[in-house]
């Protein structure tokens, strides 16, 4: 699978729950730019090895390496977002009991949502 780094991202998260669907589509398509667009520029992403990456460059490098291995992600069971003001906690139970995700999203001035904190597997 080749990395798509030039696609346009007309599909945006109008609700915080949209982020999970957009992630799944973009990671399975190998769309690195699309994945980076799901995050604020100073977001923090936890990595499977217990580390973290920060900011657009770090998140881009992480996803470039991930999609290079051509993974296939299946949809999980998404829980309704918990919201307060312009923040939302999103979470998805991963298929097959493989854990769960936890993310914090922030509503942008244009009404769309982007993740600011992402822990892909909390269990």
What are these regions (language model features)?
Residues 2-34, 44-123:
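A beta-strand edge to alpha-helix "cap/lid" segment located at domain peripheries
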């Amino acid at each position: 699978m080749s990395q798509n780094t030039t696609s346009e991202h007309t599909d945006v998260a109008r609700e915080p729950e949209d982020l999970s669907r957009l992630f799944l589509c973009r990671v399975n398509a190998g769309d690195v730019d699309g994945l980076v667009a799901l995050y604020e520029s100073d977001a923090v992403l936890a990595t499977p090895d217990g580390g973290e990456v920060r900011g657009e460059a770090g998140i881009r490098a992480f996803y470039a390496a991930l999609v290079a291995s051509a993974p296939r992600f299946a949809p999980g069971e998404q829980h309704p977002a918990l919201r307060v003001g312009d923040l939302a906690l999103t979470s998805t139970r991963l298929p097959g009991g493989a854990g769960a995700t936890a993310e914090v999203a922030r509503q942008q001035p244009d009404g769309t949502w982007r993740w600011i904190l992402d822990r892909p597997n909390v269990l």
